[in-house]
Curated annotation (Swiss-Prot):
This is Cadherin-1. The keyword ATP-binding does not apply. Cadherins are calcium-dependent cell adhesion proteins. They preferentially interact with themselves in a homophilic manner in connecting cells; cadherins may thus contribute to the sorting of heterogeneous cell types. Promotes organization of radial actin fiber structure and cellular response to contractile forces, via anchoring of radial actin fibers to CDH1 junction complexes at the cell membrane. E-cadherin is a ligand for integrin alpha-E/beta-7. Residues 148-256, 257-370, 371-481, 482-589, 605-688 form the Cadherin domain. It is a single-pass type I membrane protein.
Amino acid sequence: MGLKRPWLLGAVVLLTLIQVQGGLAEWTQCRMGFSKEKYSFLVPKNLETDKALGRVIFNSCEGPVRIQFASKDPNFEIHKDGTVYIKNPAKMKDNRKTFRVLAWETKGHVYSTNITLKREGHRHRQDLFSGKHSHHPKSETGLKRQKRDWVIPPIIVSENEKGPFPKRIVQIKSSYAKEVKVYYSITGQGADTPPEGVFAIGREDGWLNVTRPLDREAIDNYVLFSHAVSSNGANVEDPMEIIIKVQDQNDNDPVFTQSVFEGSVPEGSKPGTAVMTVSATDADDSVDMYNGVITYSILNQEPKEPTNKMFTIHSESGLISVLTTGLDREKNPVYTLTIQAADGEFGKDRTTTATALIVVMDTNDNPPVFDPTQYTAKVPENEVGYEVARLTVTDEDIEGTDAWNAVYKIIKGNEANYFSIQTDTGNIGLLKTVKGLDYELKKQYILSVIVTNKANFSVPLQTSTATVTVSVEDVNEAPIFLPPVKEVSVSEDLPSGQVVATYTAQDPDKEQNQKITYVIGNDPAGWVSVNKDNGIVTGNGNLDRESKFVLNNTYKVIILAADSGSPSATGTGTLVLNLLDVNDNGPFLEPQQESFCQKDPGFRVFTIIDRDLSPNTYPYKAELTGESNENWTAIVTGQSILELRPKKELEIGQYDVMITLLDSFGLSNVTKLHITICQCDGDKMQCEEKAAIAGGLGISAIVGILGGILALLLLLLLLLLFVRRKKVVKEPLLPPEDETRDNVFSYDEEGGGEEDQDFDLSQLHRGLDARPDVIRNDVAPVLAAPQYRPRPANPDEIGNFIDENLNAADNDPTAPPYDSLLVFDYEGSGSEAASLSSLNSPNSDLDQDYSALNDWGPRFTKLADMYGGDED
């Protein structure tokens, strides 16, 4: 865009006719570098060492220049003249192989090109040199000439060119054009492959044209192949490679990789400390031109304290670092920088900006300070873990960090380690007692406490100190027994009232002059007493070393000492009695039950036990008394073993053997042994059944008895259930007809007792079956009688049975008075019971008024005639 005149100059050069004389291309433009960006060599399948493949040409444009070549593929090497040789033997597995070649010139610039090896069989005009010392072919004098490939440098076309289009770039012309009519065409990217139609060539004149503006950022190189054919389509020349390189124009702004960059730096950092790196990209060319070279700078800094240039940025790398001292988080915790990225040779062409946020990290540059620095406290004596004071500090560093967390230490006044100080979650120092203070020992403590941080100071700082004055308060302390545990030795036969020990306590509160009273705190056996005034402990006369309350010959008694303070305080002392043994327990035998066989019984061993201690134990003597001496022999063997054996064969049964044992001092004790003689021989004991009969029932017998009892109870229960089932008979809802009875009750008795049910059963009616015939005149019913449901077998259907039959009876058209005319004045034959007519009512029949019967209708006419008419 801004290189209009250079384009015109380049156009003049590029439009210079390139004559291809005998296949040798001529050009006037020179550009340092390889003559081609790609070389193609035709090679056999097997690559042998020291074989020359071809030569790459480097254009220095400035006369002889020392060039060094190198191959990126270790199987090939490049000599100084550009000849490519095979270094290691290999095989061409594929039809082509590509590797890269580099060239360095004296100024340090590096150039590169690609070499493609093609297997034989592909159409190519490149010669293959036969040996390492082969020479390149040269033109000979005379008419004969040697042809070689078309070689032209890349054609440079600037991007973003203005029209009119198409624009001519270069003209291609074959040397055979004088002999035959030559037609030109191009193929490749930008011609017949996407993007198609960017380049076009005159079919007859060979002018290569560009048809539209180019964009280097889209495609920076186009590789085309020009073709020259005759009118019959035959190739006049081999296809020639044309490389069109798009020259960059500065048409793209730099772009930062982030809109906002974030970094951090510790406060107090020295100049040169790296903070962060910003980066930007530019789509323009930064290799051959300065269009894509980016230069960084700082446009603005906020806040501008302590100076407006606290940071600097490297113009090429974008590294931001500290420029000067004075970073202080407490004053300026964040800096905002406006960063500019500019391209061009002097960094003044296209620009863009971004923001860099730099957080100043806190360091421990502020000490914690006590507020206040003086503390006073009162602490009761003997209190452990008592909170003495809560020390507070202020710190300007960030709360919750190691630079803010306080660490307290007592540096003076705590030589006896009575106090400790810890930091709580609120950064407060909690001063507590770790041991009980003693008012009588020391009444006041003055402590010096310093405070630091968990993190070390980043700069030299002075620590803060606080003073804590602790006053000890006097409290009523319990009396103290000295020693706390006192041991005395007493004989277990100590007489009652005998002094065991004097066990007293001292009152720490000497200034209060209090009286101490002693009592027994714990005496499980009740063996001692204590004088409440002087602490003298006496025995109660019943000490026993062999008691269950004695453990390892010792007996413990707790003594309490209470002072007269208000409230009273009580101290505790332990009196340990070591009981001395006396010979008060006679020896006895274990076990006290044993069995012998009737035949060849042998002997049994018993253990002699004596609860006393030596020398009140062995040696022992054994004596059999009464009948036991006639049947048994007892011998003491060893210290505590007794052997017992029968003197003769005894009858089967139980025997009680009385043995008297005497210890070394003659203290005796009689043991009764229960011996069973069993029907067996020697050691084959068979005493189970006998022992069970003699000593009680065995387990199997007990189980059998219990099983029999349980079976009997079960049988009894089944019998009761059977009887109950037989008795419970479900009564029908209606009684049978043959059980219907009439009863005559006398209601004029108002008395009680049993007379109301004392009546003559013989006076009852004999029953409906024995009644005399009733005089009746039957009239045949006009309608059919209803069908009554028979009595169901299931008792649950009785209710339905009654309801249905009752309904049928209520609607029976054959029921009286429709079906019969009954004569009611016939009372039947004589009855064993008295006639009711003998019972006269207060008024006779003559006094009764039956005229109302006439109002009952024709159905009751006969009845009205009988009672309301004449005597006739």
